[in-house]
Curated annotation (Swiss-Prot):
DNA-dependent RNA polymerase catalyzes the transcription of DNA into RNA using the four ribonucleoside triphosphates as substrates. Its EC number is 2.7.7.6. This is DNA-directed RNA polymerase subunit alpha. The keyword Nucleotidyltransferase applies. It catalyses: RNA(n) + a ribonucleoside 5'-triphosphate = RNA(n+1) + diphosphate. Residues 1-236 are annotated as: Alpha N-terminal domain (alpha-NTD). GO terms for biological process: DNA-templated transcription. One of its GO terms (molecular function) is DNA binding.
Amino acid sequence: MSVIQKNWQELIKPNKLMIELVGGSKKVATVVAEPLERGFGLTLGNALRRVLLSSLQGAAVTAIQIEGVLHEFSSIPGVREDVTDVILNIKGLALLMHSEGPRRMTLKASGPGEVTAAQIEMGSDIEIMNPDLVICHLDEGATLSMEFTVGMGKGYVPSTQNRPEDAPIGYIPIDSIFSPVTKVSYRVENSRVGQVTDYDKLSMVVETDGSVGPEDAVALAARILQDQLQLFINFEEPQAVSEEKKDDELPFNKNLLRKVDELELSVRSANCLKNDNIIYIGDLVQKTEAEMLRTPNFGRKSLNEIKEVLAQMGLHLGMEISNWPPENIEDLAKKLEEPY
């Protein structure tokens, strides 16, 4: 392992991601990641929360046109709500759009009774996630004819930015909230790994409007962060020594065939490996740091000791070795005469 690689490979990485729906709803979930290095719970939690609330793409109504209405401060005959109240209700529409947009939806209704989102007519590329949403109430004999303009975007866009230059008379732009994520909260707790108790556990509660699931929303937010941070990496990924230097006759580093007894570890570390049935170095390097720390009586001091010894052989914890163990491992091990 190179010095550069140590900057990230020697940090403990989360190996458990638990996602649990809250109250049987597909819109709310608790997302838990652990263990994290101390301080990383706050760092990742805050970054993910900001991206979830501001940067995910979604669909929303950007403008409406109501038959017989010229501006948003009008009233509609036979409609109990005025136009501003109707607009407030429309802002609550949760939409899923399968195309770029913009698209049109229409609504025609007659009284008496309430008008809901289920009465809106749309193309096959738009879905309404909350059809029970009440838009307005009509009196006896009243009629309502509306047209909605739907677009894609992110975050919050004010009505002034939703008015095109060639907007016709009666075109009423509205504020749009495109984000499919409605609420995000998080907390950081201690996480235990083996004998070490000061790691972080990140717990997030993510609520969406149903157009995207909480699990997918978190995955998208993480992908956005990954893409944004890529620019700051100014070096090529170094190749691990273990992948470059392999024995001519073996499909892997020959040191993997040595027994852990040859590492001259402290009595405590050696006993921990023995109790965990780790015989060969090849068995050892496939263990992650988190797995090692879960070994009884195995602490950070023992972990650092093992990592240092492995590094001297060009090896490290968390390696993936194909076809291990070989069928004739005992015979191969006997052929290695030179001691470490």
